Amino acid sequence: MAIRKFKPYTPGTRQRVVTDFSEITSAKPERSLIVPKHRVKGRNNRGVITCRHRGGGHKRQYRLVDFRRDKRNINAKVAAIHYDPHRNARLALLFYEDGEKRYIIAPAGVKVGQNVISGESVPIEDGNAMPLSVMPLGSSVHCVELYAGRGAQMVRSAGASAQVMAKEGDYVALKLPSTEVRLVRKECYATLGEVGNSEIRNTSLGKAGRRRWLGRRPQVRGSVMNPCDHPHGGGEGKAPIGRAGPVTPWGKPALGLKTRKKNKPSNKLVVRRRRRISKRSRGGRDS
């Protein structure tokens, strides 16, 4: 997979950088694995906005992805690589020997016609799913379960991978993409390799309209609003915030406040916290 740059024929193509979609082998999804999806547009069950800047965008159908990989010791053939509008990663369509079809997150390097399998005693190859207890130290994994049988909950985005660092007792230490080292039960399943489409980080939408197609609405700084709309608003010209620190539109502390509970039970499973990102490298903006 590669990225594609455009000549500045128009202002929209001047900054546009997209993936070339060369790994996509079929334009139409598997009919039996798609369902309608009602888009909530950032609202909760009462219709109140809980996530701002969401709405619009192209109509989508949800692809049913197999995050459990619970068909044990049954060979599956990669029939196609499909596009998924709900994620940056690609989907691999699997045809199992018993006739069932399933989608999985497409690992990097997996080709059409390749065989993958899930089980405890399967070959150490990219795309195969197995318990963390049987994976070699230093191997890269993705689609990691937090609880056995619940399905993959971590390391699912495009280009992501975790590294098996150590094994001790009933737990396996994983180094996550955030640099956090966390203990996971050894019977939890994961898939070997990293998630494909890693070049997505080098792309650029190029224009505001393309962002609207994805369902993202404009984001306005609080400092340019009126005081009735945001705590940062009001004043003459470029006025300061007027508070000890930045806050959300609802008056809660923002930009740097730790939100994880100090007595959370899973704290004992975190061996090393993630590396702090400095304000300069983060490039945060006014909320």
From Swiss-Prot:
<dbReference type="InterPro" id="IPR008991">
    <property type="entry name" value="Translation_prot_SH3-like_sf"/>
</dbReference>
<dbReference type="GO" id="GO:0006412">
    <property type="term" value="P:translation"/>
</dbReference>
<dbReference type="GO" id="GO:0016740">
    <property type="term" value="F:transferase activity"/>
</dbReference>
<feature type="compositionally biased region" description="Basic residues">
    <location>
        <begin position="258"/>
        <end position="287"/>
    </location>
</feature>
<dbReference type="InterPro" id="IPR014722">
    <property type="entry name" value="Rib_uL2_dom2"/>
</dbReference>
<dbReference type="InterPro" id="IPR005880">
    <property type="entry name" value="Ribosomal_uL2_bac/org-type"/>
</dbReference>
<dbReference type="InterPro" id="IPR022671">
    <property type="entry name" value="Ribosomal_uL2_CS"/>
</dbReference>
<keyword id="KW-0689">Ribosomal protein</keyword>
<dbReference type="GO" id="GO:0015934">
    <property type="term" value="C:large ribosomal subunit"/>
</dbReference>
<keyword id="KW-0687">Ribonucleoprotein</keyword>
<dbReference type="Pfam" id="PF03947">
    <property type="entry name" value="Ribosomal_L2_C"/>
</dbReference>
<comment type="similarity">
    <text>Belongs to the universal ribosomal protein uL2 family.</text>
</comment>
<comment type="subunit">
    <text>Part of the 50S ribosomal subunit. Forms a bridge to the 30S subunit in the 70S ribosome.</text>
</comment>
<dbReference type="Pfam" id="PF00181">
    <property type="entry name" value="Ribosomal_L2"/>
</dbReference>
<dbReference type="GO" id="GO:0019843">
    <property type="term" value="F:rRNA binding"/>
</dbReference>
<dbReference type="InterPro" id="IPR002171">
    <property type="entry name" value="Ribosomal_uL2"/>
</dbReference>
<comment type="function">
    <text>One of the primary rRNA binding proteins. Required for association of the 30S and 50S subunits to form the 70S ribosome, for tRNA binding and peptide bond formation. It has been suggested to have peptidyltransferase activity; this is somewhat controversial. Makes several contacts with the 16S rRNA in the 70S ribosome.</text>
</comment>
<keyword id="KW-0699">rRNA-binding</keyword>
<dbReference type="InterPro" id="IPR022669">
    <property type="entry name" value="Ribosomal_uL2_C"/>
</dbReference>
<dbReference type="InterPro" id="IPR012340">
    <property type="entry name" value="NA-bd_OB-fold"/>
</dbReference>
<feature type="region of interest" description="Disordered">
    <location>
        <begin position="221"/>
        <end position="287"/>
    </location>
</feature>
<keyword id="KW-0694">RNA-binding</keyword>
<dbReference type="InterPro" id="IPR014726">
    <property type="entry name" value="Ribosomal_uL2_dom3"/>
</dbReference>
<dbReference type="InterPro" id="IPR022666">
    <property type="entry name" value="Ribosomal_uL2_RNA-bd_dom"/>
</dbReference>
<protein>
    <recommendedName>
        <fullName>Large ribosomal subunit protein uL2</fullName>
    </recommendedName>
</protein>
<dbReference type="GO" id="GO:0003735">
    <property type="term" value="F:structural constituent of ribosome"/>
</dbReference>
